[in-house]
């Protein structure tokens, strides 16, 4: 059961049934420190393949086993339908939130975007 993402190469299932691309995405998510975030596109950029939509697809299918609330839209918003749960995690971890009109319901990307320091390859 291999799949393709547009013009992206075909990703094969590994021995535990997880596509290689998904395994790579989740491996990065596992490294994001508490209180920090990455946008979907940031993860694709680190991997050098796919794009925000492909990373989002992986997160929607396989992300429940990782710290999914640390992977957000470039605007600082949580995944659709998970805003309240993400907000609770962000507050618990001390993630920097935008003040003002959105009443802290959006991450301050300038302050909370992880720079990848210490990321394993």
Feature annotation, model-predicted:
Residues 2-121:
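Nucleic acid-binding interface residues in structured DNA/RNA-binding domains
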């Amino acid at each position: 059961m291999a799949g393709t993402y547009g013009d992206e190469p075909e990703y094969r299932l590994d021995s535990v049934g997880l596509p290689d691309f998904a395994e790579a995405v989740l491996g990065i998510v596992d490294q994001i420190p508490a209180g920090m975030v990455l946008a979907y596109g940031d993860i694709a950029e680190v991997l050098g393949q796919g794009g925000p939509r492909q990373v989002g697809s992986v997160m929607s299918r396989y992300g429940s086993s990782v710290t999914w609330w640390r992977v957000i839209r470039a605007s600082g918003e949580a995944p659709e339908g998970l805003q309240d749960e993400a907000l609770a995690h962000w507050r618990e971890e001390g993630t920097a939130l935008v003040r003002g009109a959105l009443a802290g319901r959006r991450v301050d990307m300038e302050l909370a975007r992880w720079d990848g320091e210490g990321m394993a390859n």
